[in-house]
A protein has these predicted regions:
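Residue-level detector of functionally pivotal "anchor" positions at catalytic/ligand-binding pockets or at interdomain
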Residues: 237-260
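C-terminal trimerization/auto-chaperone modules of long, extracellular attachment fibers and adhesins
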Residues: 262-264
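C-terminal tail/sorting-segment detector
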Residues: 271-282
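A glycine-anchored, Pro-Gly-centered beta-turn/N-cap motif
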Residues: 130-133, 268-272
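Carbohydrate-active catalytic/glycan-binding domains of CAZyme proteins
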Residues: 1-238
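Surface-exposed, short loops/turns at beta-strand junctions within beta-sandwich domains
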Residues: 213, 266-268
């Protein structure tokens, strides 16, 4: 899914590099054999993100929706890396960064936790609240996510992006698997800039529940480079103090277990294990 914009409904529509959306001749524009990288990406094939156990890819057939309060959403279908052509519908909230480009929330929409107005008029997280260790996911161009390259690529793990770990330090530096700098910009807003391995991103900070967890809020950052490459970051907003959990039986069935290994219902409060991951339910 790509984004172009224009000052006029009649165009011309261009991306951040000034490349037009209109082609003068046929050019393959997806997959690892693509001849052009035009358009600002919203997302690509990815896996192991948050609590997801099945990777998602080949997102498309999308529609945009804006509610009466100006909150925007992208509705699309996604395929999976499980060896089938089955698909499901997903909804991600959209935000606008300081450069006027759309960026997609890192997780599926499960209820309004951050509004478009809040991003533009409030500092949802102060700098000290943003300091910490994050998972980061980059969505590059030329991912092998469509069947022009290989019949199985539409539903395989080919070129699926996996998260790295970085730390946003109090001195404005970024360390870990990727390095760079970060800074909040425009006082009274939730705009942020990041530099990751030499690439500059403009984005927003938002609060959002992690996928597959109904009540686990995360500190999230969604951003895009001027060349159209998106970056997602998140860290859990709450911590249980448990660093790791050993599970001797399969817990990828969606059932909820307490720390004694007993199955509990969705109303159970406290530390539980869901799909092999710890969750604090309140």
């Amino acid at each position: 899914m790509r984004v172009f914009r224009s000052d006029s409904p009649e165009g011309p529509f261009t991306d951040g590099k000034g490349t037009p959306a209109v082609y003068s001749s046929y050019q393959l524009n997806y997959g690892n054999n693509s001849a052009t990288n035009r358009g600002m990406k919203l997302m690509g094939a990815y896996g192991s993100w948050g609590a997801m156990t099945t990777g998602e890819r080949a997102q498309g057939h999308n529609s945009a929706y804006v509610d009466d309060n100006g909150n925007a959403f992208v509705v699309y279908h996604t395929k999976f890396d499980n060896g089938t052509y089955g698909h499901q519908v997903r909804v991600h909230q959209l935000f606008v960064n300081s450069e006027g480009w759309l960026v997609a929330a890192p997780f599926r929409f499960t209820g309004l936790q951050t509004t478009t107005t809040q991003v533009a008029t409030q500092r949802i997280y102060t700098a000290d609240k943003l300091v910490g260790t994050y998972k980061v996911l980059i969505h590059p161009y030329k991912q092998n996510c469509a069947y022009n390259d290989n019949v199985s690529a539409s539903y395989s793990k080919a070129n699926e992006q996996k998260p790295h770990t970085v730390t946003l330090n109090a001195d404005g530096t970024i360390s870990g698997d990727m390095t760079g700098k970060w800074a909040l910009t425009q006082e009274g807003t939730s705009y942020i800039t990041l530099s990751l391995n030499g690439r500059e991103y403009n984005g927003v900070t938002i609060r959002q529940n992690m996928d597959y967890y109904a009540d686990v809020p995360a500190v999230c950052i969604t951003a895009v480079s001027q060349t159209g490459v998106p970056a997602w970051l998140y860290k859990e907003e709450t911590s249980t103090g448990i660093q790791s959990v050993r599970v001797d039986h399969n817990t990828t069935d969606g059932k909820i277990y307490n720390l004694l290994g007993q199955v509990v219902d969705s109303h159970y409060q406290g530390v539980v294990i869901v799909n092999g991951k710890k969750v604090l339910r309140r």
